[in-house]
Structures are given as structure tokens and as C-alpha cells.
UniProtKB/Swiss-Prot annotation:
Keyword entries, A-Z: Cobalamin biosynthesis, Glutamine amidotransferase
Taxonomic path: Bacteria, Bacillati, Cyanobacteriota, Cyanophyceae, Synechococcales
Active site annotation, chain numbering: C336 (nucleophile), H433
Family matches, as SUPFAM superfamilies: Class I glutamine amidotransferase-like, P-loop containing nucleoside triphosphate hydrolases
Gene: cobQ
CDD domains: GATase1_CobQ
Gene3D superfamilies: 3.40.50.880, P-loop containing nucleotide triphosphate hydrolases
Name the UniProt record assigns to this protein: Cobyric acid synthase
Pfam families the record matches: CbiA, GATase_3
Sample GO molecular function, one term: catalytic activity
Keyword Translocase: no
Amino acid sequence: MTPPTPLMVLGTSSGAGKSLMTAALCRVLKRRGEQPLPFKGQNMSNNAWVDQSGGEMAYSQALQSWAAGLEPNCAMNPVLLKPQGNSTSEVIHGGESVGMARAETYYQEWFKPGWLAIRQGLEQLRQQHPHGRLVLEGAGSPVEVNLQHRDLTNLRLAQYLRARCLLVADIERGGVFAQLVGTLQLLRPVERPLVKGLLINRFRGRQELFDPGVSWLSDNTGVPVLGVMPWLDELFPPEDSLDLLERRGRKANAELEIAVLRLPSLSNFSDLDPLEAEPSVQLRWVQPGEALGQPDAVVLPGSKQTLRDLKALQASGLARELQRFSAGGGAVLGICGGLQMLGRELLDPDGLEGAAGASAAGLNLLPLQTRFGGSKALRQRQAVAHWPTAESCPIEGFELHRGSTIALEPLQALCQEEGLGWVQGQVAGSYLHGLLENGRWRRQWLNQLRRRKQLPELAEDQGHHSLQREELLDRLADAFEANVDLTPLISDP
């Protein structure tokens, strides 16, 4: 039996909504009895996930795999570039770190190995799911004319697989007609027939007022507009950290304010999604140089460059503000790189984050020492937490870090399992990404904050955040089915 024709979601630009439209398409196809196989040949992101085998992949492909009813598999994202700063990225092939690349030499040195990794990922998925339909996501714009000859993940892949493409444009940015018409005009003659439909994303207003524009696009491009998706940004956060400052406004019923430090090399900010989803919690992102204020708690999230981000906090004065906040009894939670910064000392003997033999004083909110080195810890974990309450609380998540941390003084462990986290007073840190997805643990931590404000406690019998994520994916798919006609994409001639 021949597998169904692959589909591909292209965008007129970065941030057009490709990732969520791909997730929506996966969930809709799953509802229709197909087995969608999400795939993005190359992604650039520090928002990562670790699959069951310990392979590293972009979080957006993990989200798409859940939409497809599958466990995340690093074969779905065979090339991941993790920016380090200074035009340098860590290169992940097939879930494993294979080196560092500089922007100016990336395609000379990494193009052929990248294309090989992409084909190997495709082959692995097809072997595992021979009757599944590939649902591909492009990257950025497919018509960057100076880069087309070095394209790894847009139209090169679409041509290789003879995929039917859906071109998405974000009307919220303005200029949607120029976005779509310009992109189509810049396609090469062999590429344009691959585009079977157009999609307008993030529309706000009365649809009937835009209908003449829809007709104009179809008539003047010869490509049908398959749908107009409404504004749905309240469902999921944007994928890229550059969009964080454009996040939602204040919640009407928020009772707790939690400040999150927006580190220059911020990573895995999806760890904060469960807090963002709490109706009573207002997140406030604070950049170095901005005032910390008097929040109810502070979260230090993950970092791709822990020493560099720590230096930025110290140089801006935000580190001193955080130390004063903690000395006054303020609650602080550090995750992964944030945990490392909370410690007393950070050592880098092999120069993984800078000059060999470098060391730095931490925030000294926990008596910990972190030594960078050795192989990267990449594994899913199940553990039992004994804080913020003494009762046992099962939790799960994943580790994704280099280096090891030890306590320099007797210190309360956050978990029964050694080395996953430590606590002293109101300051806690953990290596466990996904910690806040554990509903019962999250509510225990929030109730600790609420008691300090004499607020009534929240129910703690909360399921894992994945249950809420499933509801959001269904709402996304509902909107997609209601507003998009897939017939030209999925119907065989």
C-alpha cells in the first residue's frame, strides 16, 4: 500500500504560524482516521524536548507529535540548531550533539551532513509508520533568494517528497496580500505547482469584510485560499523567545504575580506554560536592567549560556535585587540553568561556556557548586518530591544539561532521587524540565505562596498539564476544521 501524499506547511515569514497550523493539521488528520507524521527537517530553537530514547528535538515538533497521537521522536526533527550567541549554534543531528557551527561557514561545513540526517530521519519515520502521512513544516520564508541554493528544509524537501504545500501568511503583521503574492512570484517555475492552497492566519474582525480580498487572491494568483484562521494566540505561546515581550496582557482575576527573568540566552521557556495557564497567576517577564519589583515569587528559567546570563544579571544589578528579594523572605525557583545560577560557585574547567578554567560566583542563594563538563544529561525522569509539602508527590519531566551540581553544605533535597533538586527556606532549584507540568506539585507550590498572602488554597488534585494541552489541541483543531477546506490538499486526483 502506497502511503498518502505528504503535506507541507510553508510560511511567508518566520512567525507566520506554521508550527501551530502543522499541529492543527496533524490533529485533524488523526480525527479522520489517518496517522499523521510531523516532520521538520531543520529547526533553530532553544526550546527543546528529550524523547524516550534520550534524543534531543525541538519542542514544537514534540507538540505536533502529541497532536498526531504519537510519542515525540527525535527523527521528527533530525537537525536542530541551538543558538549560543555570537553567530554560533550547537548542532544536533538525530537527537545527538555533533558539534558547533558558525553562521558564516554553516552551509559549507554542515549542508551535506544535514541533508543526510534529514533523509535518515525520514527513513526512520517511514519504517516505523509505513502507512502514515508525512506532515512537514517549513522554516522561515521559502523564498530567501540568497539562500535558496542551500535550502535544507523548505522547497528542497517539498520537491524531494513531491509534497502538496499550504502557504500561510500572518494578517496581523499587515501587508498580507504582498506577503502571499510576493512569495508566489519568487518561487521558481518548478516549485510553484507544489503550492496547492493559501491560508490567512490570525484574522481579527468581520469575515465578510475580508471576503473580497480572499476572492482577489484566488483570482490573481490562481491558487485557492483554503481558509481564514481566527486569532488564537491565547491557546499556545509563540515558539521563539523573541516574541515573549508580545505575550498576553494582564489577567482580570490574577491573585499572584510571578516574575520570570528573561535571560539573554533563555531556553526551554515552555517550562512556564503551566503557570501561564493558571487563571490566578500573572507572569511578568523581567529583563536585565528592568526593576524586579515585589512579586510573589521569582522564577529563573533555563539558559543555553549559564555563565554569560549570570554575568548579565550581575552587571545589570538584577542579581543584587534578586538577592535582596530572597533575603526578605521572597520565594525563588530555579530550573536547570536557573538552578545552577542560584548556587555559590560555577566552574568551567574545559571551557564549555567560555575560556577553559573559568569560574564565576553564583547568586549564593543555595550552597551549591556546579562543574561544567562531561557528556550532556539527556533523559526522561520520574521522581518523588518531598517539597513544598512533606508528603510524597510523584513528578515527571526530563533532564537536559551539561555539568553536575553538588551541595557544599547539608541541604534539603527537593526529590527522593539524588541530584534532581535542592531547597533552603523559600529558595528551590531543580534540574527537572517540566516540573511545573505536574499539576499536584504546581498547586502545592502555588498554595505555599497563597498562604503567605492569606488567600484561599487552590484544589491540589490537578492532573498533568498534558491533559490541558490535549484540550487546547482539540480547540485548535476545531477552529481549523471550521475555517479551512482541506479538500485540495488531501484529495487524490
